[in-house]
């Protein structure tokens, strides 16, 4: 008797980027984020989905909602941007998501990069930075070079190693 391979039929549907972004926005707001935080998270997740990185698209929504429901993350946090030096900003994300912290700092960071030739941003007191490329691409669109690094749980074992050393998304570059 031969093994039978079950066929799984899956329905596929297409949705326009703006519609997905709006749907995700509504989901985030209904689960306790401010409208501003929801817009930023929705854009990030929709961008990841559009770009084929499903692991950082709508796949992430249950995790986001779980952290909101448990109080692990503050969905209404208002990031506080501190101008530290001519080429340095620091953002306290207020125990919120990291993406809104970056969004709050981006205009001044771009200004500093143009005037000082280089700028550094440090975000602290934040949760889950998600996929990095949607957050560095706007700097490239401004004609700048951007490098983003993030610490995360170690789960990637480098070639030749015997234990995890890197997170799954430690570096992004845009030009």
Predicted regions and their residues:
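Glycine-rich anion/phosphate-binding loop at the beta-strand->alpha-helix junction
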Residues: 118-175
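Structural signal for hydrophobic packing residues in well-ordered secondary-structure cores
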Residues: 24, 28-32, 49-53, 65-72, ...
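N-terminal glycine-rich anion-binding loops that anchor highly charged ligand groups
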Residues: 12-20, 33-59, 73-84
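General structural feature for long, well-ordered alpha-helical segments within catalytic domains
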Residues: 16-24, 37-44, 57-60, 64, ...
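Metal- and O2-centered redox machinery and metal/ROS homeostasis
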Residues: 6, 10, 75, 100-103, ...
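Generic N-terminal amphipathic, Lys/Arg-enriched alpha-helix
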Residues: 2-31
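Active-site cofactor/substrate anionic-group-binding motifs, chiefly glycine-
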Residues: 56-110
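Alpha/propeptide regions of enzymes that mature by internal proteolysis
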Residues: 29-30, 39, 43-46, 99-102, ...
């Amino acid at each position: 008797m031969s093994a039978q391979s079950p066929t799984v039929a899956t329905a596929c549907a297409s949705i326009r980027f703006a519609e997905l972004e709006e749907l995700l926005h509504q989901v985030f707001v209904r689960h306790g984020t401010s409208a501003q935080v929801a817009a930023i998270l929705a854009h990030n997740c929709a961008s990841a989905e559009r770009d084929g990185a499903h692991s950082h698209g709508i796949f992430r929504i249950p995790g986001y909602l779980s952290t909101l429901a448990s109080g692990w993350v503050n969905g209404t946090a208002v990031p506080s941007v501190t101008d530290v030096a001519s080429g340095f900003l620091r953002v306290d994300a207020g125990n919120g998501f990291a993406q809104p912290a970056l969004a709050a700092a981006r205009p001044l960071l771009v200004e500093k990069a143009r005037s000082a030739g280089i700028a550094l941003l440090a975000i602290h007191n934040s949760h889950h930075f998600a996929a990095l490329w949607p957050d560095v691409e706007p700097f490239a669109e401004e004609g700048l070079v951007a490098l983003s690094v993030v610490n995360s749980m170690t789960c990637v074992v480098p070639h030749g190693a015997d234990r995890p050393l890197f997170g799954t998304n430690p570096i992004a570059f845009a030009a």
